[in-house]
Amino acid sequence: MVKQIKDPIYEYVDIDDDFTKVIDMPEYQRLRNVIQTSYQALYPSALHNRFTHSIGVFHLGRKLFASFCKNVKSDFPLFYHGDWKRLEKTFLLACLLHDVGHSPFSHTGEKFYKDNFREEIQKRLPANIELYRDMEHGTGKPHEAMSAIVGLKLIRQLGISEIDEELFVRAIIGVRYEEKNDSDDKLIENITIGMLNGSLIDVDKLDYLIRDGYVTGFNTMSLDVERLFAGYTIADYIDPSASKHKVPAYKRGALSVIENVTFANDLERHWIQNHPSILYDAKLVDLAIASYDSFMKKKYKDALTEKTVFTQKALSLEGYIGQGVPLSLLSDEDIITYLKNGEDQSAEAVWLRKQYFDRSERLKPLWKSESEFSHLEREILGTAIRRSFKAALKAISGYAFFINESEMEKAVEQKKLMEEAALSEDEDLKNAAQTSLQAQEAVIRIFHIFNQFRLDMDLDFKFAFLFVEYHYESNYSKLQNSDIYIEFSKNRVIPFRDVLTVAAVQASEDEKNGYYYIFSSRKNIERMQEKGLDFGREILMYISRNWITL
């Protein structure tokens, strides 16, 4: 029996019995309460969740696989010796379950997962030595590995048969086969893995680009997936050494769509994901999750014996209920409820509650984009100061978010402890303390500069900063090294990098070191405006005059 789900983007999505059983499971329904992005701080309508996204990925996966299978059978009828039906079912289950292991607030919370996923996956597939070996190069992102583990559990629990469990795991975590035996079949299976977890274009990325654009209204361009999918196949490529081999390829009609997908991804990363309001909100969520984790482990220390509450068990319906802990199907609402109920009266929790729910308390950015920052930085700060100050900010970002009197006192106290350790007779401890002390002195200088600036300008000591490791670099640079090929004809298959029509935007070595946002209170911003001063420019000029490079 086929069930239909109404989707605002794809109209109706057909779901067969085995897939319906998966969707009905509590672990899958949990995804209704895991937000897809952190964009709602900037785009209030961005309320879509991992549930709807996963259904969308499943739908696109079915369409892409059907087109690919049809094209390969037509172009190379005897190439694949495996079972296409089994391959399709495995792939579609991976599409459906690829995010089932996401933590609360999606990517913001996944860093709290433990990092021994290779061993955890091996326990569930002990006979797959090849997979264990191939995982030496990585097991994907933390949520991908957790999704593979939870997904495998659900498949077995439901008794779903006629699938390749190893391929299911590989597709979710993006680990391709490296063994060259049965290379024809492995090529098809590796291409299938890339359809879900590719470097530049896959059904996961396509759905989130389309869906994010739909709910935010940030529609950069139309992504014609029908045209893209219709031209996906394999082709004979003759490399520079005159060796001929099969490669995944798109028909030439897909050229414009590939560029559009790359461009849409660039714009979303540059103008949405790294907008200061979104980064600020994500930082608050990050602090809230850490606070929740710490609170739960202290309150239920006898039952919660693992390093963190972010475990596979916490994602299940049973959870820790049997141990007297109100923790199961862990999702966003657990973190929100923790902030709302006020049970945790620690200073940090009280501050977080106020910051998260009262928007008037939030500090505002002094510049709104990386582009604006880069222009100001290049204009005002010399190269030596730029690098030295950025390095100090990067050091402070490990433990401080706010720049205020309280945080400055903590930094001074920490310096005293380092000074004591630097006098230790233990040489290792002494050397480590001396190295840390130099960095700490730069951190304290940052506090002093901001404190003196606010005194000179008659402002409150309320600042915050966020250091952003990412620097905008177009995905076109990745296309230059990608494994995407275009088939112009049977005898002319060209790497996509050779037909690029848009130049890659390259970051300088200095820019690759990251950038930062500085925030201050509305009151401070209004005071500077009353004085007719550009707050961002003034603070960078003050840093330029007073920062001495080490």
Feature names for model-found ranges:
Residues 1-93, 100-550:
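Histidine-centered, transition-metal-coordinating active-site segments
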